[in-house]
Amino acid sequence: METPAGESSARGYGPPPAPAPAAERKKSHRAPSPARPKDVAGWSLAKGRRGTGPGSATACGTASSARPDKKGRAVAPGTRGTGPRVAGVRTGVRAKGRPRPGTGPRPPPPPPSLTDSSSEVSDCASEEARQLGLELALSSDAESAAGGPAGTRTGQPPQPAQSGQQPPRPPASPDEPSVAASSVGSSRLPLSASLAFSDLTEEMLDCGPGGLVRELEELRSENDYLKDEIEELRAEMLEMRDVYMEEDVYQLQELRQQLDQASKTCRILQYRLRKAERRSLRAAQTGQVDGELIRGLEQDVKVSKDISMRLHKELEVVEKKRMRLEEENEGLRQRLIETELAKQVLQTELDRPREHSLKKRGTRSLGKTDKKPTAQEDSADLKCQLHFAKEESALMCKKLTKLAKENDSMKEELLKYRSLYGDLDAALSAEELADAPHSRETELKVHLKLVEEEANLLSRRIVELEVENRGLRAEMDDMKDHGGGGGPEARLAFSSLGGECGESLAELRRHLQFVEEEAELLRRSSAELEDQNKLLLNELAKYRSEHELDVTLSEDSCSVLSEPSQEELAAAKLQIGELSGKVKKLQYENRVLLSNLQRCDLASCQSTRPMLETDAEAGDSAQCVPAPLGETLEPHAARLCRAREAEALPGLREQAALVSKAIDVLVADANGFSVGLRLCLDNECADLRLHEAPDNSEGPRDAKLIHAILVRLSVLQQELNAFTRKADVALGSSGKEQPEPFPALPALGSQGPAKEIMLSKDLGSDFQPPDFRDLLEWEPRIREAFRTGDLESKPDPSRNFRPYRAEDNDSYASEIKDLQLVLAEAHDSLRGLQEQLSQERQLRKEEADSFNQKMVQLKEDQQRALLRREFELQSLSLQRRLEQKFWSQEKNILVQESQQFKHNFLLLFMKLRWFLKRWRQGKVLPSEEDDFLEVNSMKELYLLMEEEEMNAQHSDNKACTGESWTQNTPNECIKTLADMKVTLKELCWLLQDERRGLTELQQQFAKAKATWETERAELKGHASQMELKAGKGASERPGPDWKAALQREREEQQHLLAESYSAVMELTRQLQLSERHWSQEKLQLVERLQGEKQQVEQQVKELQNRLSQLQKAAEPWVLKHSDMEKQDNSWKEARSEKTHDKEGVSEAELGGTGLKRTKSVSSMSEFESLLDCSPYLAGGDARNKKLPNGPAFAFVSTEPVEPEKDAKEKAGLSTRDCSHIGSLACQEPAGRQMQRSYTAPDKTGIRVYYSPPVARRLGVPVVHDKEGKILIEPGFLFTTAKPKESAEADGLAESSYSRWLCNFSRQRLDGGSGASTSGSGPAFPALHDFEMSGNMSDDMKEITNCVRQAMRSGSLERKVKNTSSQTVGVATVGTQTIRTVSVGLQTDPPRSSLHSKSWSPRSSSLVSVRSKQISSSLDKVHSRIERPCCSPKYGSPKLQRRSVSKLDSTKDRSLWNLHQGKQNGSAWARSTTTRDSPVLRNINDGLSSLFSVVEHSGSTESVWKLGMSEARTKPEPPKYGIVQEFFRNVCGRAPSPTTAAGEESCKKPEPLSPASYHQPEGVSRILNKKAAKAGGSEEVRPTMLSQVGKDGILRDGDGSLILPSEDAVCDCSAQSLASCFIRPSRNTIRHSPSKCRLHPSESGWGGEERAAPQ
């Protein structure tokens, strides 16, 4: 085909080549599109444009002579110098075309021509365009005589390639129109347009030269090109649709997989449902409800609901995304169509100037003006037609997109319909052969669903029968139990009843056996269906592979298989599909019939029926095989079963006879069928055999199969006959004992399956689908024989079944004729099938032709792969941008959600901590809030954060830096999560404790209720007895009033009981909270004590050495001044002055110093010398220095007393200060103190009080130095009493005696510690200037002497357990004129200057001061006192006082958790009364001392069990009444004055916070009233310390706080006078929760919240 075309083009006059071979030549590498419809006529593709190549362009030749290209065409050399030409149409449409510059010099471009060698000249649709282009190029080069090589060769003759070519052909050429018409034969224009074009061509050829003709040809070629472009775009759109269809197919497959998974899940849930039903039936039978099962099921239901909701939400989201993407794709398609239309409009606009120039040039070349209007009109018509064609193409594109969408939707609906209902077409066409396995698969699925439903029904029936069986067994057991104790009569009754039970049991067993058989049958059928499904899938894969192989072979060889092979393949596939479907249907019907037969047998016979065992391989034969009887019954039950079986034996015999008759009918039908088959094969069916069985072996194989079936039926009939005979024998001997009814059945059961297996093995090769063709004809007859039951004739057991006998000819003649008629009908149907096959052959030929055409088109489509790839890349890039945009939005949303989650998580954490804190403190949450963990505003969060930061201030000893609370680092998140985990664990522990307590309370309540019910019953009994005894007198009583009074009294008692019960519960809860808190605090204290013990021991050693040296250096001075002070007689002067008692505390930083020995002081001189030699008193030369640990000092002053009233008793003021410079410097003025209750909890409801130190009740004394600063002295702080008129001067009005004592104390302290003090007062005179010893009595001097001796006995000093000391001074004025001063020492625990950052400054001490004031028990008092220190007339103190606890003060117990310590001692060790102190045991001097001074030393030997020692002054006889005497006995000291007297001369301080510490109101009010009465009648007591406010916190004149460190922690110095009669019930070492190292977050909250319950 190519050679003539090349020759004609070389000569120049031949017709152009046909376009189809050219297209076939160019599109040889195109792969077939898998989803393009090939059968629709409207989808056929036009010829594509030619591909660019070296031989398809005419401007690429560089030689001067013509040379043939690869296609066989010649290229003119004159086209070298034509220069670049513009092809207007293709430059607009093919925007992606790249110019190919020619080689060699080029002249300036001439006017635009029709062809363009630089922009895909080869894309033209016909060879005529090339010819005309060459001619027009030569003519244009001749006209434009430029200075190029083309101009020089204008007049030269053409090259050899053009030599044979004529100048423009004559216009009258008769074959020119036909050539033009044939060149546009493939055009899409209608026939009228083509005829118009041919007429126009003839007219133009007649009118003038070939200019107009060339123009028309160019327009036609452009029209063809544009149509090809439209087809190309249409094909690309189809390919794009195919790509999207593939994605939809993948999604559909995934959805199917999900559907399969959901169906599996549904089956599992159905199984669980059945299991639950069984459980519910069991529960209904037993009457017990499984609570765990119900809870588990409820949980499963909740989980499943949540999962389903989540899955529905995800499906909705995916559906929304899919709809959005489809909308975007639709919009993109619309935009693509619009851009194509815009490009076409622009192309037309660009064509207009080129057409103008062509018209002008054509008019110049033709030179005829009369034909010009006609040409213009024709060109205008052509343009209009072209424009209309473009618009029509745009509309077609739109319609095409709509049709593609509709096609996709219809395909999806069709697939759904097929997946649900299967293929409903009865006849399968050739195209649907590949889909035949799908239809079979759907059919099998339907069958499987039916089988599963039947299995479900059977399983439910099994459950019901099991329940019924259990009920019957229970009845049998009851009957056995009732009949076991009786005699023979009971046994006979039981046997009669047992017969009925045996019958029901046998019936139930038969039912159960039947159900098991059907279940086994269903299992086999399901297994067979699965195997068949696998086989069908394998066949489908094989057919698909064969189909693909056929397609590839046809693609490679461009031919299809031969017609006979295609015919045979189609016929074989059809037959295989039909026969396999029929076989499966028949097998299923056979199984259904067998199950129906079993049910009929079960309904007919009332005894044990034989099992029906199905041959699963053949699928069409059944055999009656009995089953074993199961477990053996008891002897009497066995006899009853035998009787029942004997009664049922006639029924079994009748059933066996029916089965044997059915076998006779089957054998008779089979014999007639075999004879008719042979006759048909011999006479009429030879042609049918040739068509049906190509191997000519079908007849013998059918005969073999029928013979095998008949043999098996004969064996079964023989066995049935034997059973019938034995049954007759058994029925004949009915008078004898009933024999076993089925003696031959075991042999039968053992023989049948073996024969079946042998037969199935022998005939396994014959059971092929072709062999079942004839078998299908007589199987319905067998079923019909079973249904009609036409079994009247009695079978002959000795009959031998032959294929054919002469005596049976008459009986079988009619059947043979019937069979012949049936075979004739089958022959006719086969002829019809042959005709259909011939038609199929014809269709196959047509399909082969269409297939060849499609292959050509596919090869052409291969050249368009580049453009398609570009479209795909554009779509992919667009999709990628859309995905990037979508994921960026998702990322932003996720970031916002994560930030919101962090924010909410922090809110939840803060709320949870707040809740735990309040719960630990025993506070009740507000009930009106729905969710206490919900934080509704940022304000609430910042309030919580502020509280947290304040607590962090106290714990870290730093001010709040105001940092932002949001930390975005991973470490902060991990820390927050860890804290949340710890908080949740604590919450879980608390909840467990609450639950445990709740269960205990419930048990207690139940016990109490039970006891109350018993008591109520007893009381009712007593009341009834009393009423009976009263008799008639009861009727005379006023009934209603008496009952109403009793009712009111009962209601009041119930109300009181409820109140007391609620109070007891509250007390119990607070007690548990306190015990839990104090157990934690004890562990933390022990841990810290062990950590700091080594440091304290080191300091103890150093200070002990230093003290021992200082004591040795001070001994000569003590001896010298003791002699001088004996002659001193200045006691009256000291009495005349208004002296002030100074009480101080010496708490140096010692770890091991203890109280050594107590000595009596007989005179003031000895007391002065004792004070001079004391290592804790500083000298005046070291005032301006500080102690090593930097303790601050303060001078203590008291309120004045009126001078005209003598004080009979003055309360000793004991002040303490544990603060150091470091802790005092960072102490905030707004720091809070922890309130402590001095009430030890007692489970019996009795509150036991202990006595705190005096400084804890009255506060720390406050003075100012010269600069106005506050000074707190931790050493000896002696309290002084000054007159009221000197109250304005504050510290300057102190007496010289008190100033001397203070100065001397500081000097000794400096001397003992090797440092100096920061003293702020003037130098004070010596003690002998007061001349106090002149008026001393002998007792006083003896006391002073005792004190001196105690000061000297340093080598015999001993140690106590508590390691620091405190002096208590009490000034008492008796009825005589002698004023005595008693100085006692109390011990305080060691302190350390080491502070942890996580501990509050208020918790800087090692051990709480309270550990010294709590004794082990109020019942344990030291009794080994050698001699009392005071006169016996005042009696010994009462060592145990208890007062009834009140319900309104239970809030004070919430902070208590006292544990038994290792110390032993008395609770009176803190008291400073004049009664004999039980701690002063082992004192050797026999004098009654009013000055009892205990010296400090570094020795560590211990004598006392309790680390406290005090001296007490003698009080006046009791004359204040019962209440005051009670207070005196409990507190151990005289009642202190009221706070009103102290508040007269000081500012009233404002409370620290709403959570400030309160005074016990009831006790303080009584104390204040009694003290005021006593002071008004006799004297005014020393008032409380100045600057003590209602909240018990010390303030200076400006209201600023003075917070000693240790006292502030334990809140021991901020209590009112009422707490003085509170005593401990056990000894402990305790500190506040703010000291807890493990709970730093609660340190700031505890003090604020624990006082809130008031």
UniProtKB/Swiss-Prot annotation:
Its main location: cytoplasm. Keywords: Cell cycle, Cell division, Coiled coil, Cytoplasm, Cytoskeleton, Golgi apparatus, Membrane, Mitosis, Phosphoprotein, Secreted. Residues 209-238 are annotated as: Required for association with Golgi apparatus membrane. Residues 1628-1638 have a biased composition (Basic residues). GO terms for biological process: cell division; chromosome segregation; insulin receptor signaling pathway; negative regulation of gluconeogenesis; regulation of autophagy. Induction: Up-regulated by adiponectin in primary hepatocytes through the insulin signaling pathway. Down-regulated by amino-imidazole carboxamide riboside (AICAR), an AMPK activator that potentiated insulin secretion. Residues 1406-1505 are annotated as: KR-rich domain required for microtubules binding. It comes from the Eukaryota. The modification Phosphoserine is found at residues 1165, 1251. The record marks 922-923 as: Cleavage. Residues 1122-1145 have a biased composition (Basic and acidic residues). Residues 55-66, 132-147 have a biased composition (Low complexity). InterPro entries: MTCL1-3, SOGA1/2-like_CC, SOGA_CC. One of its GO terms (cellular component) is midbody. Residues 102-113 have a biased composition (Pro residues). Proteolytically cleaved into a C-terminal SOGA 25 kDa form that is detected in plasma. Proteolytically cleaved in primary hepatocytes into a C-terminal SOGA 80 kDa form. Residues 1-188, 348-379, 1122-1146, 1427-1450, 1537-1560, 1627-1654 are annotated as: Disordered. Pfam families: SOGA (PF11365), SOGA1-2-like_CC (PF14818). Residues 216-279, 308-349, 448-546, 816-843, 1079-1113 form a coiled coil. Interacts with CLASP2. Interacts with CLASP1. The C-terminal SOGA 25 kDa form occurs as a monomer. Microtubule-associated factor that enables integration of the centrosomal and Golgi-associated microtubules on the Golgi membrane, supporting directional migration. Preferentially acts on the perinuclear microtubules accumulated around the Golgi. Associates with the Golgi membrane through the N-terminal coiled-coil region and directly binds microtubules through the C-terminal domain. Required for faithful chromosome segregation during mitosis. Regulates autophagy by playing a role in the reduction of glucose production in an adiponectin- and insulin-dependent manner. Associates with the Golgi membrane through the N-terminal coiled-coil region and directly binds microtubules through the C-terminal domain. Belongs to the MTCL family. This is Microtubule cross-linking factor 2. It comes from Mus musculus (Mouse). The lineage of its organism: Eukaryota, Metazoa, Chordata, Craniata, Vertebrata.
